[in-house]
């Protein structure tokens, strides 16, 4: 067939209704591309938010507003708060940590004093057993934990101590099907001296504990500050990550183009790992309309 004949045929098809055939071909191509994305492991992002960033917004109002723009979860709640989100048809993707006291009267379970000290283990084991049991009763499956600060302790000893205590907790977590998730935090800006401040350290702790019920919370904001290389790190350690948090760098504010991270690209990378959990917005809004900033964050992460 000559080029002239081929061109004339295309023009004839368009004039006589062939345009619909061309459109059908385009749709078919789109469907094929979507199928390729699905085959590569792409899954929808499940959206959550950390309640503490919206202290001046009631939990009821946060659920009502958030559900309208795609939030499925409000997290870092204690068990007695969770029925509120469930009433709205939402969930709590990550239950907050228990805080308790040792026999010596030291408050433990928070960021600074936790699993890297042997003397904290007895109190923490009792508190986490209760928290895990309550989490299971609510139909949930993820509880946050922390390493604690170094306070003069070297990283190797701290890891051994964390592993010793958390190994004792794993039979309880495994029995109830609840994952204990340790957060990676930066020790440069926000949490000076925090021990679990590198992904590789957390991943080695996961290997040492050796249970599918112990994982990491990869906080994108915190790890950008500590080590950068976010997408490559997510790809490398994807099997040891059970949860993600967001935040703009620098400042921990909105995740829009006022900060340096490319969140749509990061979300696409998370999708390609086949991750089926939640990504929680954990930035502190600077704008007067806090919920508008939250809505924007959800939209940015919907890829």
Regions found by a protein language model. Give the residues of each.
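Histidine-acidic metal/acid-base catalytic patches
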Residues: 2-67, 75, 138-141, 196-218, ...
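Active-site acidic/histidine proton-transfer and metal-coordination neighborhood
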Residues: 16-29, 112-215, 225
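N-terminal small/glycine-rich loop or linker at the start of catalytic domains
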Residues: 40-50, 98-114, 149-150
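Feature marks short, surface-exposed loop/turn motifs that line or immediately flank catalytic pockets
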Residues: 53, 80, 98-102, 149-151, ...
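Active-site-adjacent beta->alpha loops and helix N-cap segments on the catalytic face
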Residues: 82-85
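A short beta-strand-loop structural module common to alpha/beta enzyme folds
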Residues: 72-78
């Amino acid at each position: 067939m000559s080029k002239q004949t081929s061109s004339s045929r295309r023009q004839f098809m368009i004039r006589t209704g062939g345009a619909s055939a061309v459109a059908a071909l385009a749709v078919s191509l789109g469907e094929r591309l979507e199928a390729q994305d699905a085959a590569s492991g792409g899954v929808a992002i499940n959206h959550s938010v950390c309640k503490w960033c919206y202290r001046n917004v009631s939990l009821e109002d946060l659920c009502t507003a958030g559900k309208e723009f795609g939030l499925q979860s409000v997290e870092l709640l204690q068990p007695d708060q969770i029925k509120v989100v469930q009433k709205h048809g939402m969930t709590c993707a990550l239950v907050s940590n228990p805080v308790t006291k040792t026999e010596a009267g030291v408050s433990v379970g928070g960021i600074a004093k936790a699993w890297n000290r042997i003397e904290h283990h007895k109190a923490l084991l009792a508190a986490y057993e209760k928290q895990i049991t309550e989490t299971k009763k609510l139909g949930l499956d993820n509880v946050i934990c922390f390493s604690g600060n170094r306070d003069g302790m070297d990283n190797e000893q701290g890891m051994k101590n964390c592993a010793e205590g958390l190994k004792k907790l794993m039979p309880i977590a495994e029995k109830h099907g609840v994952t204990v998730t340790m957060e990676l935090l930066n020790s440069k800006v926000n949490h000076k001296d925090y021990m679990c401040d590198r992904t590789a350290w957390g991943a080695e702790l996961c290997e040492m504990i050796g249970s599918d019920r112990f994982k990491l919370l990869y906080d994108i904001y915190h790890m950008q500050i500590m080590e950068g290389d976010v997408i490559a790190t997510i790809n490398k350690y994807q099997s040891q990550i059970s949860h993600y948090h967001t935040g703009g760098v620098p400042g921990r504010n909105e995740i829009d183009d006022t900060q340096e991270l490319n969140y749509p690209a990061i979300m696409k990378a998370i999708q390609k790992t086949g991750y089926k959990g939640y990504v929680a917005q954990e930035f502190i809004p600077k704008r007067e309309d806090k919920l508008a900033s939250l809505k924007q964050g959800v939209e940015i992460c919907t890829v």
